[in-house]
Design a protein with these regions (language model features):
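N-terminal secretory signal peptides that target proteins for export/translocation
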Residues: 1-16
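Intrinsically disordered, low-complexity segments
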Residues: 1-2, 23, 93
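Extended rod-forming repeat segments used as scaffolds/tethers
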Residues: 12, 16-17, 26, 352
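Residue-level hotspots at or immediately adjacent to binding/recognition sites across diverse folds
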Residues: 35-353
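Short, surface-exposed loop and linker segments with low hydrophobicity and enrichment for Pro/Ser/Thr
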Residues: 21-22, 208
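Bacterial N-terminal signal peptides
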Residues: 22-32
Length: 353
């Protein structure tokens, strides 16, 4: 059983109706993969991915699942996480040092290139979930999550500092284009910015209270945020001002399926910019790319069987030349200079480009 990743109305917060991604519902999805190492076809729901090279990537998902590929997704192996909670985000500072975050304030770390993963003592209460992270270097990491959760380490994970907000706001994404400049995005149009390496954070108005699920800054000045209702925002002045962009959502081919009204404004869940290359992923198979620094976005139509699949995570190499995207039911796509090849996990086919 694959659970929907659609938006759900949840509790009210400060008089504002809250809309959240259905991350909580993932715990009832059925996992059919065996634990332990071994080559396999991935069928699990996947939420986070990290591209290490054009051929190597890591992905995380349901029930503590960690996957690794060294051949651009033709084959994948599992790694033991030591937990069964869903894992939402993964990042590496270098080839050896990486971190994973997940449900119940879970933080896992590796110092041997992912061969082994060990839990770290989280300062975030277990009733909060951690959704995203950024490993700036082997010593400095930022994580964000539920109920305003923010935490950081400056000693490689030996100790963590709780920097959570007082506000009841879910934080979904964090981006650091360099060690000094960082940005955090979340619900109700929340956008936080730092210019001093995270010592202080200030709110930046984005002109909307719509939930932002993804944020990515290519430079300290140029950034993008994505969210509900197909929202794409762009800033050219470090988040001081934002403009709405209109992405090319792939909905026309879905009209015959009878879902057009529902699919007109799908949630967009992640964005990555690197150089002139960029990728946005979201509900109902929406995958958009740019090759001109985000001036224009092109919809990449997926094969028919994947057109209703939600896509949750995307990662690009620093030069934007390659990357990976992941989503529901083991969806994996390899990205090669803006061209999409999928599925990445052994059933490769051109994505209608």
């Amino acid at each position: 059983m694959v659970c929907s990743h659609r938006l759900l109305e949840d509790r009210h917060a400060g008089g504002r109706r809250r809309q959240v991604a259905a991350l909580a519902s993932i715990v009832v999805a059925v996992l059919t993969l065996p634990a332990g190492a071994g080559t396999l076809a991935v069928k699990d729901n996947l939420y986070g991915v990290k591209a290490m090279s054009a051929s190597e990537a890591w992905a995380v998902g349901n029930f503590g699942s960690i996957y690794h590929t060294a051949d651009a997704g033709k084959t994948w192996e599992t790694r033991d996480s030591g937990t069964k909670v869903p894992l939402f985000g993964i990042d590496f500072a270098d080839a050896e040092h990486g971190w994973i975050v997940g449900k119940s304030s879970t933080i896992l770390a590796t110092a041997d290139g992912g061969k082994t993963w060990k839990p770290e003592k989280s300062v975030i209460p277990p009733e909060k979930h951690l959704f995203n992270l950024k490993a700036i270097d082997a010593r400095t990491v930022w994580v964000v999550g539920d109920w305003g959760a923010i935490a950081t380490t400056h000693d490689g994970g030996a100790t963590w500092e709780d920097r959570s907000l007082a506000d009841d706001v879910v934080l979904y994404a964090v981006s650091f284009p360099d060690p000094q400049h960082g940005f955090i995005a979340g619900e109700f149009g929340t956008l936080l910015a730092t210019a001093d390496g995270g010592r202080t954070w200030e709110k930046r108005p984005v002109g909307t209270e719509k939930t932002l699920f993804g944020v990515s800054f290519a430079t300290p000045e140029k950034g993008w945020a994505v969210g509900i209702d197909g929202l794409i925002l762009r800033t050219r002045d470090a988040g001081q001002t934002w403009e709405v962009q209109h992405g090319a959502l792939a909905i026309e081919s879905l009209e015959e399926l009878g879902f057009l009204e529902t699919l007109k404004n799908p949630g967009l869940y992640d964005v990555r910019m690197a150089g002139q290359q960029g990728v946005v992923v979201g509900d109902t198979g929406n995958l958009m790319t740019t090759a001109d620094g985000g001036e224009t976005w092109t919809a990449r139509e997926l094969p028919e069987k994947q057109r209703l699949v939600w896509l949750r995570g995307v990662s690009l190499l620093p030069d934007g030349s390659a990357g990976f995207a992941v989503g529901a039911g083991g969806f994996m796509a390899a990205i090669d200079h803006g061209q999409i090849v999928l599925p990445a996990n052994g059933r490769r086919a051109a994505a209608g480009l």
